[in-house]
Design a protein with these regions (language model features):
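Catalytic cores of the polymerase beta-like nucleotidyltransferase superfamily
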Residues: 1-374
Length: 374
């Protein structure tokens, strides 16, 4: 059973029990765009306890907000009671959630018109805010008054840029003006929330749109000021590390620690960005791997769109790391810190003369060079 078939089964069971039930939000938008749907969210007139009673396998994930996760045929679906939200005193979360009686009231609380459409199991579309028209013209527009929407929840501004990058949509002028007016509200957002939205934008078909977040002033909360970006680099992004390396190239002030990146991704991004510039040749890649390790080497190749170069080097078996030397530290005629220095000297030599990575030859060189490492 496909996810769509399982979602239809949930909608049908709700309807059979006498409730209204609709697929809603991004799944409807993506269906109309012919895109792959990853998550089917639903809204219903049924109260949370009624949903819990109707489905044998479900999880009460957010009862205070009316959400129950229904497990059906190996898929998980968020089913939420029609609701309205009031008061956003923290600029992020509603102060109160109330259950309402109509789909229209539920759709009115949503962020953008393209996300405010509902589809029933028979394919009937409810579009009260012009979402389908905006899909046609590839526009991202707020539901209702844009400034009000952004004052309610500052994260919506970052989501606007992210959606525009993922979908290739323009942001409607009034919505764009409201973003500029409300950008200071993003200071209430956590670094983790900002990081997640920036990364999704960076990994979209239009990653350069991430610089709009900077231009609007939405990234002040993570120490980044408008007007500090360089032109977007022509690079290939295929992982979180390459995404953040590209961002670092365009925004030199970007600090992975403030953005709460994990240590490995942050290190890879910074090191890879620092190495980007000259043409990437096989000889240069060998030096990068020898000095910085395979993770940085692969990341740099990916950034250049030359992953085949890393694969070629791995297949060759050429010595580019200390572990590939034909001898180990135990074979050397030195002790203590001199071991590491001599191994590094031998590796540097082998990078220049690959044929010398042979035990007898390396021991000869070690005997000659040992005095220089003491």
């Amino acid at each position: 059973m496909t996810a769509k078939e399982a979602a239809d089964s949930v909608l049908q069971r709700l309807e059979a029990a006498g409730y209204e039930a609709w697929a809603v939000g991004g799944c409807v938008r993506d269906t109309l765009l012919g895109r792959t749907v990853h998550d089917w969210d639903m809204t219903t007139s049924a109260m949370p306890q009624q949903v819990l009673a109707l489905f044998p396998h479900c999880v009460p994930t957010g009862l205070q907000h009316g959400t129950v996760t229904v497990l059906e045929s190996g898929y998980a679906f968020e089913v939420t009671t029609y609701r309205a939200e009031t008061g956003y005193s923290d600029g992020r979360h509603p102060d109160a959630v109330s259950f309402v009686g109509t789909l229209a009231e539920d759709l009115a609380r949503r962020d953008f018109t393209v996300n405010a459409m509902a589809l029933d199991v028979r394919g009937r579309l409810v579009d009260l805010h012009g979402g389908r028209e905006d899909l046609k013209y590839r526009l991202l527009r707020c539901v209702g008054e844009p400034e009000r929407r952004f004052r309610e929840d500052a994260l919506r501004m970052l989501r606007a840029v992210r959606f525009s990058a993922q979908l290739g949509f323009a942001i409607e002028p009034e919505t764009r003006r409201a973003m500029a007016a409300c950008a200071d509200g993003c200071t209430v957002l956590s670094a983790e929330r900002i990081r997640d939205e920036v990364e999704k934008t960076l990994r979209s078909p239009e990653p350069y749109r991430a610089l709009e977040l900077l231009d609007y002033g939405m990234l002040r909360a993570v120490g980044l000021e408008p007007g500090t970006a360089r032109p977007w680099p022509t690079v290939t992004i295929n992982s979180p590390a390459t995404a953040w390396a590209a961002f670092r190239l365009a925004v030199p002030d970007f600090d992975p620690t403030i953005m709460r990146l994990d240590k490995k991704t942050g290190r890879l991004a910074v090191e890879t960005a620092a190495l980007y510039g000259p043409e990437l040749t096989m000889d240069r890649l060998k030096r990068v791997v020898a000095d910085h390790g395979w993770d940085v080497g692969r990341c740099l190749c990916a950034l250049y769109g030359q992953t085949d170069l890393a694969e070629e080097l791995e297949r060759s078996g050429d010595c580019v790391t200390l572990a590939q030397l034909a001898i180990t530290g135990r074979d050397l005629p030195v002790t203590g810190p001199a071991v590491g220095r001599l191994l590094r000297q031998l590796l540097n030599h082998v990078l220049e003369v690959p044929a010398d990575n042979e035990r007898t030859r390396l021991l000869e060189l070690a005997a000659i060079w040992k005095e220089n490492t003491l």
